[in-house]
Amino acid sequence: MMESEVDSERTMLKREIAELRAALNQKEQCLRELDSLFSFATRPEQEVVGNDLESPDVAVHTKLTNDDIARYSRQLILPDFGVQGQLKLKNSSVLIVGLGGLGCPAAQYLAAAGCGHLGLVDYDEVERSNFHRQILHSEDRCGMSKAESARIALLELNPHCEIQCHSRMLYPHNAMHIIRGYDVVLDCTDNVPTRYLLSDACVMLSKPLVSGSALKMDGQLTVYNYANGPCYRCIFPVPPPPEAVTNCGDGGVLGAVTGTIGAMQALEAIKVIVGMGDVLAGRLLIFDGGSGVFRNIRIRSKRPNCHMCSAQPLITELINYEMFCGMHATDKNNPMLLLSTDERLSVEDYQQKIQAQPHLLIDVRPTAEFEICQLPEAVNVPLVEILDDSYLKRLGKQLEDKELPIVLVCRRGNDSQIAVQHLRNRFPTHFVRDLIGGLHAWTNSVDPSFPIY
């Protein structure tokens, strides 16, 4: 057998082993979730509730201490707040779901204001890409649970605040137990399935839900399920198509925008707890960070035939929200599978077999991302230009060569698959492939010095 054939066989076997391992990991994760769901359904309720699922034990305080008076003096002198407002806050419990760009400032201001008990829900770990907006985390806590990292920072700010960490994802089988013991819930997540899950659970448990979102330079804020106001399903009875949803990991966000919305989520929670001001129920606050303009608009009232919060709801228990929305309940990379493996290239195959030969390498990321980092000889043609064929004039001569391999790359190997499908329809006789895993795979498998963002 020739050396080249041996190399090809070894590469193919490595690829098959990697695919089998990935499939095994996926099956094992599914089995763990099924085991968890089965054990939850068959065990008595008191056994199901573990340490981080138990309702917070909030002591009832009837007066302020000298430390309270000194610490909170600037808000105690507010006529609409006063001693009674501070006591309500001290006796309250707030659940913050998501300790990211929104949850960090929200938790910080609630702890600083004297909220008696905070629950922190986040399954994720701290990483460097968090620091520009997730202000409770620090360099020395990289790899730590975000909930635990936030707890450390909050206790440094206010050691009198009781903090309970729920370092797990919310699922239909655990959400009710976690949420039940809190007075107010803050939705600081970045995905649609969790928004539906939180809204439905809060309706069932009669909890106000303070919902915030931020993307690029814009932010939004409202309060659901409060004072006979609408729930999330009243406004969005049908989830958006998955391809229309962008999170901050893909679309980007300015840290000060998440800070603005997160701080205002804390403000709305305080207003709900204390009973002061005009709560943003039935209204949507829209923040345009580019112009510095806040707008306040009316949203539709409670829907009489809402499947969740109407007098005769069709939904009486929590459902599979990932299936309902057609997307994952996480902002982590969820690889698309538009092409089969043999229609694509691993980064190792590209480096060994194609990179040194004449070929056309097209990077389909937006120009702003291309400027951050790029592979040698890559040509930037954003996906939108691929789809509208505006790239044809730029690359016409190269595309006329049917023998010239065309390789497409993006950040994670998702958009490049869409581009491959489009180019194959346009140039059916050309060799067109994309890089599996994109630039992230290049860093992980070929060049560790190549930056990840």
Swiss-Prot record:
Assigned keywords, A-Z: ATP-binding, Cytoplasm, Metal-binding, Molybdenum cofactor biosynthesis, Multifunctional enzyme, Nucleotide-binding, Nucleotidyltransferase, Phosphoprotein, Transferase, tRNA processing, Zinc
Pathway membership: tRNA modification; 5-methoxycarbonylmethyl-2-thiouridine-tRNA biosynthesis; Cofactor biosynthesis; molybdopterin biosynthesis
Annotated InterPro entries = MOCS3/Uba4, Rhodanese-like_dom, Rhodanese-like_dom_sf, ThiF/MoeB/HesA, ThiF_NAD_FAD-bd, Ubiquitin-activating_enz
Pfam families registered for this protein in UniProt: Rhodanese (PF00581), ThiF (PF00899)
EC number from the UniProt entry: 2.7.7.80, 2.8.1.11
Q: Which residues form the active site?
A: C248 (glycyl thioester intermediate), C410 (cysteine persulfide intermediate)
Domain of life, per UniProt, equals Eukaryota
A Gene Ontology MF term for this entry?
A: metal ion binding
For this chain, the family text in UniProt reads: In the N-terminal section; belongs to the HesA/MoeB/ThiF family. UBA4 subfamily.
What name has this protein been given in UniProt?
A: Adenylyltransferase and sulfurtransferase MOCS3
Tell me what gene encodes this.
Mocs3
